[in-house]
Amino acid sequence: MTVLLDANVLIALVVAEHVHHDAAADWLMASDTGFATCPMTQGSLVRFLVRSGQSAAAARDVVSAVQCTSRHEFWPDALSFAGVEVAGVVGHRQVTDAYLAQLARSHDGQLATLDSGLAHLHGDVAVLIPTTT
């Protein structure tokens, strides 16, 4: 089963200085499944890297490098928000979470996250990566 990485997991994997880099990397290395990204999570990574001082071209190259890994699968954003399960969504920060969870469901996959609230709300597809902090 392929696991869609939410933006925080993707960023933690790419940025060695991230507080959860080791936890995310250890989790991914211990897993033998494939992982997926989508335009929404890739865009979040690019935005984070540019905000951190990298050029847009360098950030795009990071996304390309992620996509070139053998376990990577790209999931296009092919869902309408009209079909997204929104039960439990009470704030604007949960809208993207609901979309990513629905995208994972549509691919018979899972959604990896560092967010315990997301994991609780979407327990049918979410995988909470354990951290020490």
From Swiss-Prot:
HAMAP family: VapC_Nob1 (MF_00265). Its cofactor is Mg(2+). Its EC number is 3.1.-.-. Inhibited by EDTA. The gene is vapC29. Residues 3-122 form the PINc domain. NCBIfam families: Mtu_PIN_fam (TIGR00028). Toxic component of a type II toxin-antitoxin (TA) system. Its cognate antitoxin is VapB29. Has ribonuclease activity. It comes from Mycobacterium tuberculosis (strain ATCC 25618 / H37Rv). This is Ribonuclease VapC29. It comes from the Bacteria. Belongs to the PINc/VapC protein family. The lineage of its organism: Bacteria, Bacillati, Actinomycetota, Actinomycetes, Mycobacteriales. The keyword Ligase does not apply. One of its GO terms (biological process) is negative regulation of growth. Pfam families: PIN. Mg(2+) binds at residues 6, 97.
